[in-house]
Amino acid sequence: MDSVYIYQWLYANYEVRGYGIALNNTVVCVRVPNFKQVVYVECTDPQHDPRSTFTQHGFRVYETPRACSLYGAKGVGTYFAARVPNYNAMRDVQETQGPFKIHESRVSKTMEFTARAGLPTVGWIQVSQRCVVTRTVTMAAKEYMVPNWRTDVRPAPDIEGVPPAKIVYFDIEVKSDHENVFPSDRDDEVIFQIGLVLCSGTTVLRTDLLSLPGRDYDASVYQYATEGELLHAFIAYIREHEVVAVCGYNIMGFDIPYIIKRCARTSMLGTFKRIGWDSHRLAIEKTAGVGHAKMTYIQWEGVLTIDLMPIIMMDHKLDSYSLDYVANHFVKAGKDPIRPRDIFHAYNTGLMARVGRYCVKDTQLCKQLVDYLNTWVALCEMAGVCNTSIMQLFTQGQQVRVFAQIYRDCTPMDVVDKVYVIPDGGCDSDVVSPSSYTGAYVYEPVPGVYKNVIPMDFQSLYPSIIISKNICYSTLVDQGGEEYAWQEHEGCEHDPQYAKQHALGVEIGVLQCNMAALPRRATQERARMRERISEMKIQYASMTPSVVKCNVFSFRFTHAHEGVLPRVLRNLLESRARVRARIKTTDDPDIRAVLDKKQLAYKISANSVYGTMGTQRGYLPFMAGAMTTTYCGRKLIEKAAHLLKTVVGATIVYGDTDSCYIQLGHDRASLDELWQMAVNASDTVSAFFERPVRLEFEQCIYTKFIIFTKKRYVYRAFTRDGKQRTGSKGVMLSRRDSAMCARNTYAAIMSAILEGSADVPFIAVRMMHDMMIPGALQDDDFVLTKSVQDIGNGDDNNHGSYKVRNPQKAQAAATQRVAPDDAEGYAIALRQEMVKQMPAQAQLAERMRLQGRAVVSGARIEYVVLKHQYGVPEGALGARLLDFERWRDMKVAYPLDRLYYMKSVVNACDQLLVTAGYGPVCSKVYAAHLQLAYVHKQLMRRMMPTV
């Protein structure tokens, strides 16, 4: 048997092909001919048998006596399997209005094949040597024709590691007609440079630059007379070096779509789509969307497209996702300081060497990021664990990963052994799907400073609940089993808060009547009552829930058989435990890196199951399971808090979702004593729960713990090895829409308080003053970032993803601005008025769009807040935003609104200072600067000449 590491499966012309890397690092192709899809047919009318309908269309029918729907495990005996002869037969049957429903018809052929054959979607397999063929159809070094996939191919779980892949990193540079306008595929907006870095694993094999003719190049640059020749050389480069993947940054958002457009202009699109290992097959152009971003790629045979931008966006929360910011964040290296206008000017003048170095450096940064983040290994291990393809990980959402694992567990090798059929329509109609339900339990904290707080949390709480309670689609029953019943009341007459709010409303009404009855001269009393009523109205509004709930729920789950979800989760958690144990005994750094990515993949995959169940739409929604899991989680945390107080004698400081923060022992207990008490408390409380539920000690003690409200606290932690670290949750440091100067101010004050510094007020005042002094901080410290959704680019009648608060107001304003018969002018005016009602960052994005600059939907834009003409925080915020790149070029003419930045940090810092006992220092500093600004405003108005 030959060992092959499969990195791609695909289906074409009733043949499954798997491309992989052999032990000698060559690419091989495994071909499985005549694999036919199998669907499962549900008989909806017992008086009519639809089997004859399928046999007449060429289907081969199999009896599946144990098959039933995954939802509720109902309908045993009403299903049969049918093997699809061809696409046309499947289409004809689907158009037949018969007494049947077809299920599992939307599952991809490769997912079905790997599930039935028990093969990994990405990973090591073994292929019989007798399957090697000499007459090949691909350019692979070796081809295997597998006539019997049941015996001639099998998984190879004993082989470890991920072989190095030959990857080419690339980046393109494009000319634009206007220096400040983003390229839009006009006739002369050509691709004039392509930077290439060819690597095998972490080893760089060669670095090249392909370019149109330039006047200052040396002999190492490959130059071509036309854009068509340049693109042909790029295609030939990928083919010649036999790569398994092309990689870049945002290549699915810009580079590949633009190359497709230029190839279409130069009549080379067919050649571009034949880059794969089978040059006779025309690859399919596909589009995908994650969040608000649209991605375009070509599904080449044996050549993957890896875009680092969506991968990093899904795995890391950063302030910005520009390549320059990401590279500086991870590898401490940035792009060359070249602006788009410099790129366009270089093409127009022919002096392109500097831009060429910039282009190549971008590709090198992508290579460094892949090496640093171990992206290739991470993608391979995650895809193998989730039973998906590599590209599905970042072109589709989380749900496909869970669906693939459930489908694999429900798919036997022999179709007659089928038990659970996954319905194409998702959830059955008799399963309750409410629009919202109560979330996790929260033990309300008392704000303050606490010492020696011990954090305890449930290990994999929701997966453990699903396993211990056997919560699954297939175990939900109407009668019998274990019942989970509860009520949810919020904002209704059964809610105690409702009675308090009602009483408060009555009191407000009485006060208003009393105030109306006061004599006119009682101005002071009326003012006091008005202030009191205003405070009570604010309190009344805060007590009003966003959603009114008045529900009674009851679900039953049987323990007669193990459900699919518990079995899948048990395998994931047990596999992760085995991998983590092996990491401790492995000395090989390469194997350790692979195992670490694998255990992380198991963890992420297990945690994704609960979120997938709780969706309204998707592959397998299961609100009953999600609600029951959440309910059990609430009961567990309540039980844990009760046990910690009664059995262990702990004091509960705070509890939330899956964590408890407690105090043990006496005030003078040493850290070693507290450590041992925490371990004993974990063992004692865990003994009261069903396995695998366990309350774990987090292996650290918070020597100082400052909590403000639920989900918002800061701490200083002590670990067993004597190290100390500070941390936080839910405060300004966690918010990406805060400027770095604000976060640095908060971090400095937080560290000073946690470390017990005597200079806390001085540090707060100094940090606040630094924000007001020009030159004291770096320009980057004032950058704000926010994500921008679709703003309806290019269409004045389309407002994208944003909702306009008052369209009637916008229509009225637009009508006043233009003549009644000017339809085009009205559309433009209406667009402008609508944009005024969008968030400030969307207004900035609209201005950038009108200037011809690219605004990627879903990306985070960097901007600064400009100073008002009088220096006071007045005027609409949307009109005072400017993107950071443009501001940096003209910052002398556009001073910053430093009061805005100072105000943004006042409330958060003062909450920290007041809770720690220092008083509202920051608000006093801000008030002084604000008063100074208003004095300056009055002076400017008096000194400004009148016209």
UniProtKB/Swiss-Prot annotation:
Keyword S-adenosyl-L-methionine listed? The answer is: no
Kindly state which reaction or reactions the protein catalyses.
DNA(n) + a 2'-deoxyribonucleoside 5'-triphosphate = DNA(n+1) + diphosphate
Say which enzyme class the record assigns: transferase
GO BP terms, alphabetized = base-excision repair, gap-filling; DNA replication proofreading; nucleotide-excision repair, DNA gap filling; viral DNA genome replication
Q: Which Pfam families match?
A: DNA_pol_B, DNA_pol_B_exo1
Molecular function terms in GO for this entry? 3'-5'-DNA exonuclease activity; DNA binding; DNA-directed DNA polymerase activity; nucleotide binding
- Record keywords: DNA replication, DNA-binding, DNA-directed DNA polymerase, Nucleotidyltransferase, Transferase, Viral DNA replication
Give the source's domain of life in one word: Viruses
Q: Tell me its EC number(s), please.
A: 2.7.7.7
Q: Which SMART domains match?
A: POLBc (SM00486)
* Keyword Manganese annotated: no
UniProt family annotation? Belongs to the DNA polymerase type-B family.
Name listed for the protein in its UniProt record: DNA polymerase
Which species is this record about? Red sea bream iridovirus (RSIV)
